[in-house]
């Protein structure tokens, strides 16, 4: 028998095309396959999204405050207007993410293992200090 949180993941994965405005705050979604999910305006605050597949997901205006997304795959996701305050992006793949800004990143936590889209330049001055620059496309 699967633990309750794994059953919940299966339920969420089955509805991934229709999760606009969903309340997924403070949920265990580790390793969830949410590739291509429509999470517009969803509440994912303080959720555990470690190693989750959010590639090409629409996270427009999603609340990811305090979400733990370490080693998650967000390749090609839309992060326009998403709240990333205190989100953990350590080792997260943000390659080809669209609508990500330095303003969002300055409120998040990440490390030198985090992969950024080509239009975001991160220059580290120490282990915890960086400057972020958005390049013109």
Q: At which residue positions do the language-model features occur?
A:
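Tandem repeat scaffolds
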Residues: 1-137
């Amino acid at each position: 028998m699967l633990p309750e949180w794994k059953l919940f993941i299966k339920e969420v994965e089955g509805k991934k095309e229709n999760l606009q405005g969903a309340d997924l705050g403070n949920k265990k979604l580790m390793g969830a396959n949410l590739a291509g999910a429509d999470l517009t305006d969803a509440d994912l605050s303080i959720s555990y999204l470690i190693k989750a597949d959010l590639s090409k997901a629409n996270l427009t205006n999603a609340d990811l405050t305090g979400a733990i997304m370490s080693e998650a795959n967000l390749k090609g996701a839309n992060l326009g207007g998403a709240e990333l305050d205190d989100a953990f992006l350590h080792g997260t793949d943000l390659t080809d993410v669209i609508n990500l800004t330095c303003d969002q990143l300055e409120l998040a936590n990440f490390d030198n293992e985090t992969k950024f889209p080509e239009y975001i330049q991160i220059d580290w001055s120490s282990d915890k200090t960086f400057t972020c620059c958005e390049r013109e496309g």
